Amino acid sequence: MEELIIYTTNKGACAVDLHSGNNITHFKNDETAPNLSVFLTNTPSGNPLLFSAQTKGAMMHVYNWNRESVDQQIVLPEKLSCLAASTCGTWLAGGSASGRLFVWELASGKLVFSREVHYQAVTKLAFTDGLLFSTSKDARVLGWSLVTMASDPKDCQPCITWTEHNLGVVDLVVGGGPTRDTRVFTVSTDKTVRIWDVSSTALLTTITLPAAETPTTLAVDQLERTLFVGCASGNILSVSLYDVSPSTGLVSVGGASGVVESGNVALSHHKSAVTSLALSFDATLLVSADDKGFICVWDLPSRQVSRSIKQPRAEMNPVTYVQTITTHGLPTEKYNPKTAVKLPMLKRVQDDKPEDHDILVKIQPRQKTVAHEDTLQQMVESAQFGGDSLAGKVVQLENELSQAKSSFASLKESHDTLWNIYQRQQ
């Protein structure tokens, strides 16, 4: 299973091999900005799709994996400032510069939620199990229940509100695991990274960044051992979330709302602001991009750049987004417009009353597998073959035992005869 890098610029988007750097596919006519693109493998249409909100207006481009040109152009109710999709493929969320939050049901295109929830521009959206988190330049982090959003949008209020940041929040990462064990990481222009517990809504730790650095983006490895902060200077700060204790081994840093100063460990190669970060599946490689068009692949154990990704036709367009994916589930056949299934158009107006609506569900083709009857027959034949072989071995052992008994009886008879002769001679 290979890994790919998907990245977007203000001129297009590409997918390249993470380890070789070879170009896999290219998407044309894409003009986007940071936090305005998301690649989704699991979609109602059954095809992996790249969603990319455009910077020139209230428009979103949808790209099919095996098609270079735009597959769908969707008119939005407002120009977006950030975009996110749930990994299950059910929800698509967008935030605007006015502070409005939009949530669509992808299978129907229905706009289930639309409201101004922040005082300033929404900067980042992220889904977790049953929750949607939104951050803004107003320094607040809000958590929303997706169930309440879909069932009672008029009276829906944030179930989580975090206001400890002093300046605008620029990025947010949601950790893995179920909701009760999930941690949320936020980074702000107040030069702090804060770690939150979703279950208790408590602030766990505050990590202060160097005064000379202004954070722009954030990444956390899947095991939540290390976080990486991209900065406007081009540096990437690496912050370990565990310390080594001589008595107890590894211990987590901070806790109890404590403040921790980040170390001076930095990955230095970019000469301009880092715009996006992404980690490989095993967290041994870090992909970073900047606003001058450079994309670097870092080998984290050695903290060296192992590869630089070149844009097509030697262009150097500002990179706005990077994401790592695996090739599992990606189609290999060519794009066929006759069989391709398109998503329903996203609605721009929220319905006042709940109503029945159709949803798009693509039934996947039947996979070629061994029939149950054939499998059962093979098991029966195997058991029968094993039984016949075992019975033959039993018969063979019984014959050998019978021969041994016969030989023993003959030897005993000879021994008794010789012993009697010896007794008479005495």
Curated annotation (Swiss-Prot):
InterPro entries reported in the protein's UniProt record: WD40/YVTN_repeat-like_dom_sf (IPR015943), WD40_repeat_CS (IPR019775), WD40_repeat_dom_sf (IPR036322), WD40_rpt (IPR001680), WDR18/Ipi3/RID3 (IPR045227)
Name the UniProt record assigns to this protein: Pre-rRNA-processing protein IPI3
The protein's assembly and partners: Component of the RIX1 complex, composed of IPI1, RIX1/IPI2 and IPI3 in a 1:2:2 stoichiometry. The complex interacts (via RIX1) with MDN1 (via its hexameric AAA ATPase ring) and the pre-60S ribosome particles.
Keywords: Nucleus, Repeat, Ribosome biogenesis, rRNA processing, WD repeat
Predominant location category: nucleus
UniProt xrefs under PROSITE patterns: WD_REPEATS_1, WD_REPEATS_2, WD_REPEATS_REGION
Domain of life (superkingdom): Eukaryota
Stretches of the chain forming a coiled coil according to its record: none
GO cellular component, one term: rixosome complex
Entry function: Component of the RIX1 complex required for processing of ITS2 sequences from 35S pre-rRNA.
Family: Belongs to the WD repeat IPI3/WDR18 family.
Chain positions of WD repeats: 75-114, 117-154, 164-206, 269-308
Subcellular location: Nucleus
